[in-house]
A protein has these predicted regions:
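Active-site mouth loops of central-metabolism enzymes
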Residues: 8-29, 72-82, 107-114
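Short, well-ordered coil/turn segments that N-cap beta-strands
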Residues: 2-6, 39-41, 69-75, 92-94
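Glycine-rich, proline-tolerant flexible connector loops at the mouths of alpha/beta enzymes
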Residues: 41-66, 100-113
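N-terminal glycine-rich anion-binding loops that anchor highly charged ligand groups
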Residues: 2-9, 28-46, 52-58
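Catalytic cores of alpha/beta
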Residues: 80-92
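Generic structural signal for well-ordered alpha-helices
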Residues: 32-33, 60-64, 85
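Conserved, mostly hydrophobic/aromatic
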Residues: 15, 35, 88, 96
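Non-cysteine beta-strand/loop elements that form the S-adenosyl-L-methionine
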Residues: 8-9, 94-103
């Protein structure tokens, strides 16, 4: 067993994607800056998904570019498919989480990658 624990803060992605209204890029970047100031240095900053499906994650490319310029942390993003992966890479993502599903129905509805 390891003597270390690694905390990855997911609030800027998982928390904000469930808000009823989209949060501005400025507010998202400020949120991430406050997490860095609090000592959380590994942060999932957004998801490269369709803004029609999850409007709260629109402009994740701009959020990532801005926090990469600020620095001070390791910034992760989430992608559901190859299109999201390519967009994340183009935006400068260094750590990309890819989510998938064993359920064909879920994949068709949510990930659109079957």
């Amino acid at each position: 067993m390891s003597d270390q624990v690694r905390i990855i803060e997911m609030g800027p992605r998982d928390g904000l994607q469930n808000e009823k209204t989209p949060v501005s890029v400025d507010a998202r970047v400020a949120f991430i800056e406050s997490l860095l100031a609090a000592g959380l240095h590994t942060v999932e900053v957004g998801a490269f998904v369709s803004p029609k499906a999850i409007p709260q994650m629109a402009n994740s490319d701009e959020v990532l570019r801005r926090v990469n310029q600020i620095g001070g942390g390791e910034f992760h993003v989430l992608v559901p498919n190859e299109k999201g992966y390519e967009a994340a890479r183009a935006a400068g993502a260094k750590v990309i989480a890819v989510f998938g599903s064993a359920s064909e129905g879920f994949s068709l509805r949510t990930i659109r990658c079957v």
